[in-house]
Amino acid sequence: MDSLSENEFRSLLQQGQLTELHRRLDLEKVDSGSAERLALNAQFLFKTGQIESSKAIYTLLANEQGNWSARLNLGHCEKALGNHQQAAVHYRALAEGEDASRQAIAYWSLANMKDRLLDKDDRLKLIEMLALNDLSPAARALANFTLGILEEESGDFGAAFGYLTEANDLIAMNRPWRGDAYQQLIHRLMQFAGEARHRAETNVVRPVFIVGMPRSGTTLVEQILAAHSEVEATDELLYLDQVSRSLEETVGGYAKRIKRLTSEEMRRWQQFYAESSALHCSDTKPVRIDKNPNNFLHVALIMALFPHAKIVNLVRP
């Protein structure tokens, strides 16, 4: 029996401390407990790639009247399993609800499947949604993103650009963007990446990192490599991002901290990555893939911690 309170569980989930959760959870009892605890268990299982187990819990919760969140996450599980038709059934049911903010999430989930599941009636409902004065900025942004995709699919690129611009402007209100600071970070990381391979040695793990801009073909390359009997695909892991955030919070910032990592710190982060990524692996295949397009920002960190790792960078002309 684990000793985790729901507050502790929630906090560890939010911090991405999945290895600590794995250590402290009684995995034989994840399908029992209060509705709140079951939802937390399902989140943990989903985040560690145990989608079928997560789906089973969300199915139980979704049968409870009014459990909107469970129905949404059940759709996410079906999508992750490749069952797009069933995922669409769940999303569509939620889009027919009464709460505009929840409808916006459901419509975006449908649009984000890239299966052209929305029609003219949906477009009109989304436009009506934007006319609501009490629609939250987050929901308004999702509605604009969804309309942007709809207009792009119809060939009206001018209208699509307008909706996408509005959506990004809404997001920027809460997450301001500083292009100059980002460019400075990239230049500092590029200067360091060339010398990073000579700084660390490790036999902990030697993953294959697949990076590149979104929609560049990273998923296809992952599927091709994972067809090999000794290669295992994992998920779009966020552990490098966790390391980068921890380094960013220290004196000097991300780029400078990579350059100043001590041998002890490198061993600690190597072990953290190895243990965390192992949660997504079966232990039967020697090579694991970490496919996350956004990890292009962490190439210098990869070179510092895993000098013998393979990095596949996808560029789409």
Model-predicted regions and their roles:
Residues 8, 41, 74, 107-110, ...:
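Structural register within alpha-helical repeat arrays
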Residues 12, 45, 78, 113-114, ...:
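Residue at a conserved register position within TPR or TPR-like alpha-solenoid repeats
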Residues 18-19, 51, 84, 120-123, ...:
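TPR-repeat structural position
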Residues 200-306, 310-314:
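Phosphate-binding active sites in nucleotide-utilizing proteins
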